[in-house]
Amino acid sequence: HYAEVIKKTLRIDVNRVPGAGAAGGMGAALMAFLGAELKSGIEIVTQALNLEEHIHDCTWVLTGEGRIDSQSINGKVPVGVASVAKKYHKPVIGIAGSLTQDVGVVHQYGIDAVFSVLTRIGSLEEAFQGAYDNIYRASRNIAATLQVGMRSQG
């Protein structure tokens, strides 16, 4: 394996570094030969967008991706956004094209509620064709529900 060659030659163990790649991929090469530091994608996006400032000033956070499931806890955007939001005690709602049976695990990682944007069963192509309308409708309904809740509180 490439990672073993790096370890033997350079005395750098990239085998257990998240993001280095299976058995030493591109991430491992950049670390070993160029001294690169690996960062998660959400960490880079958070910094580039100044996400903390935006979240600090909001009432609640809406985030999403194509599918929210147990894999979402492994560095995907919704859980990364939720992590920032929870620093400021903001409620987080996730939306996705699909949810799986194991989606409940994301609640342990800061996502308070999750919703699928799909209104009917169809093909992947149909889901993509209706994506704008489906996301708009789901977001509007979530916002309306939040407004109802806020009005009922006084």
Each predicted region: which residue ranges?
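N-terminal loops that bind phosphate or other acidic moieties
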Residues: H1-G154
